[in-house]
Amino acid sequence: AMSTAELGKSLAEMIRKDKVHILTCTGANLEEDVFNLVAHNQYKRLPNYRDLSPSDELELLNNHFNRVTDTCIPEEAAFRRIEDHLLHIWEKAKSEGKRYFPHEYMYQLLLSGNLEKFYEIDPKDSWLLAAAEKDLPILVPGWEDSTCGNIFAAHCIEGTLHPSITKSGIEYMIYLADWYRDNADPGIGFFQIGGGIAGDFPICVVP
């Protein structure tokens, strides 16, 4: 929800000014910054969302809108713009026998330049693009609980991809333990996007 609320308008500048050195976020917040970047004009705003009836909610669902409070994400339209490019990156990793973290695949996607023709906001307002340009570490535990994670799993079920090309949450945990020991002094800018696992995960590692 934070990415959908356009957190990037403030966070991207913080990243560019080196105020943030590592991030943790949910899989949804990782991908929703990209969705907003490439499909912003197709979002639907619902300032009176508290007055929605069950039939109103059903209509949104049938029109492929995913409501996050007062904002509806056109997930199908947004994902359609990135799917082929992301699938190509996954397939390339498989063919080369390489493995990456979920955020690293998104970095490859953004830095390839293939999405630039779809940009519907000023790219300086994308926090993920700013992080990609700085190559900041991003912890994305439970990434499979996201649209991109679901699609990746579907390709694995079909046999076109293999789960092993995406590094796991355990590997994120080990990475953070090593990174924290190397970088904790004299202090770091650690930024959390989203609740639940995005906050619990790093707290489990630090002690």
Model-predicted segments: where are they?
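Short acidic, glycine-rich surface-loop motifs adjacent to enzyme active sites
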Residues: 1
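Conserved catalytic alpha/beta core of Sir2/sirtuin-type deacylases, generalized to analogous enzyme cores
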Residues: 4-207
